[in-house]
Amino acid sequence: MFRVLNDDVYSPAEIQQQNPLAFGKASSLFTDNRSANDQCETGENVRESGQDHVKRPMNAFIVWSRERRRKVALENPKMQNSEISKQLGYEWKRLTDAEKRPFFEEAQRLLAVHRDKYPGYKYRPRRKTKRQQKLLPADSSKLCKQMHIETLQPFTYRDGCANTTGSRMESQLSLSQSVTITNSFFQNEHHSSWTNLGHNRVTLATQISADFPFYQSLQPGLSCAYFQY
């Protein structure tokens, strides 16, 4: 029994020998996904892979808030970054022009150094949406399209339900109309049958009174005679 179980267990090398094409496709897809994830984590851009990203020169507020942010973060370790930024903006507005002057001078000095180092620099903001789309390989883009189509299937299913509901309502309406017509037909037939039956009874009574002369010799309390027919 143990020998049979051991024979059923296949090693990765045997699987690769049996189906090398499928194994190669799976491995290539796995490596492509890993490379795409690595690019997303490191923030590398395909367009700027061969060029170093040049940062903008710091302004007076950035020069002041760089040290102040560290102090606030150390004093309030549980405070979020967004709250720290709000507090720094409020404090910067409360500073006077004399208190802001040294930071403006430092920002002017950094701007001059940046111009000397990068004479033809132009600020070009990155577009995050296009950058994320370019980072995706061909296989992952196809997978995203397939996932997008699968997410749209519930809406198609709802449309199908609406169509089936409409067809059911139309069938029920036609069925109710046919039932109404059938009921009216049976009512007319029933009324005509009762009318014919009453007419036949009157004709039968007239024939009986004409055919039997002893009808007049009945007792004075009786106005009619009943016969089984």
Curated annotation (Swiss-Prot):
GO CC term (a single one): nucleus
Posttranslational mods: Acetylation of Lys-130 contributes to its nuclear localization and enhances its interaction with KPNB1. Deacetylated by HDAC3.
Keywords associated with the record: Acetylation, Activator, Calmodulin-binding, Cytoplasm, Differentiation, DNA-binding, Nucleus, Repressor, Sexual differentiation, Transcription, Transcription regulation
Family matches, as CDD domains: HMG-box_SoxA_SoxB_SoxG
This protein's record includes keyword Transcription: yes
Transmembrane segments: none
PANTHER family the record matches: SEX-DETERMINING REGION Y PROTEIN (PTHR10270:SF161), SOX TRANSCRIPTION FACTOR (PTHR10270)
Oligomeric and partner information: Interacts with CALM, EP300, HDAC3, KPNB1, ZNF208 isoform KRAB-O, PARP1, SLC9A3R2 and WT1. The interaction with EP300 modulates its DNA-binding activity. The interaction with KPNB1 is sensitive to dissociation by Ran in the GTP-bound form. Interaction with PARP1 impaired its DNA-binding activity.
Function: Transcriptional regulator that controls a genetic switch in male development. It is necessary and sufficient for initiating male sex determination by directing the development of supporting cell precursors (pre-Sertoli cells) as Sertoli rather than granulosa cells. Involved in different aspects of gene regulation including promoter activation or repression. Binds to the DNA consensus sequence 5'-[AT]AACAA[AT]-3'. SRY HMG box recognizes DNA by partial intercalation in the minor groove and promotes DNA bending. Also involved in pre-mRNA splicing.
Family: Belongs to the SRY family.
Protein name: Sex-determining region Y protein
Organism: Elaphurus davidianus
